[in-house]
Amino acid sequence: MGLIYLALYKGRGTLFNRLIRLWTRSKYSHCELVLADGRWLSASAMDGGVRAKRIVLDLEHWDLIPVPWADARQILHLFEKHQGKGYDWLGLFGSQLLPLTIDNRRRMFCSEFCAAALGFPLAQRYSPALLGEVVQRVHAITTAGPQDEAHA
């Protein structure tokens, strides 16, 4: 099916983007899953919720992490199940700003969608920054060469 990427937005963006970066103490304010066919999947406040679109990649504004272990069928299944659902403002504030686990099954926010699509439990607990860290670590582990067992 081709390689899937986690795209992390680091551009200046809107006031909302800047507030997310400030609160999470991160350079990232948004994330998307980029499929091999060029579609970008996420939940976007600007687009009103869960959607697919094509975005012209500008590496000044986006960092990409390959996700070779991602299951495209699982991602598409979750997308089809949630496509058109609204943006989860309450869940975003409740799980990212307060120590609450709010899970609205009718709405999602960006990192919640991406984490759920990648199969992570408690997807609403992930910020774009935390999801990027976890995916980067999984990528490093899954692409590491075989260890020399004599040194184990």
Predicted regions and their residues:
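Short glycine/proline-enriched coil/turn segments at helix->beta-strand junctions
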Residues: 35-39, 71, 118-121
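Donor-binding and catalytic core of enzymes assembling or modifying cell-surface/extracellular glycoconjugates
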Residues: 1-27, 128, 132-138, 149-152
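A structural motif
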Residues: 71-92
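Activation targets extended, charge/polar-rich intrinsically disordered C-terminal tails
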Residues: 95-152
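Glycine-rich catalytic cores of cysteine/serine-nucleophile enzymes that process amide/ester linkages
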Residues: 6-67, 93-104
